[in-house]
Amino acid sequence: YLIEDKKQFRSYCDTNEILYIQEKLPIDRDMRIIYVGDEVIASYWRIGGENSFKNNVAQGGVISYDNIPQDALALVDKVAKELGINHAGFDIAEVDGHYYIFEFNVFFGTRGLLNQSIKLHEIILSYLQKQTPSIPTDPYTPFPKVS
């Protein structure tokens, strides 16, 4: 949803409990970089349709596998490792040589994998099998236990 003035912004705020807001960047494409385990397994450009600011394939964008910047792949690798992410699709834009991570999400679209013969489910399963301990362990508790 593109907001172009204060009136539209107020209307958006009045009708949405949760706001997802980002600056509109001067781009006609962004990258989807898929990370599983401890590596990038796929990457591609999502190029917006004519007269659209949206690049996602589900809303008319097209896919290109040409010339994905190595710096963007390295950025995803670094961020994923620093944050302990082992499965996500990263959406990244490049503006004037700077990279902007819009989001990373475990529920990412995979249409860009169809032409690459990448079987995501097999890669995820292989990673999980390598990570599975041979003996049962206690589940990780992210918050202190309250007695």
PLM features: what roles do these ranges have?
Residues 3-6, 38-39, 107:
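Short, hinge-like loop/turn segments at secondary-structure boundaries
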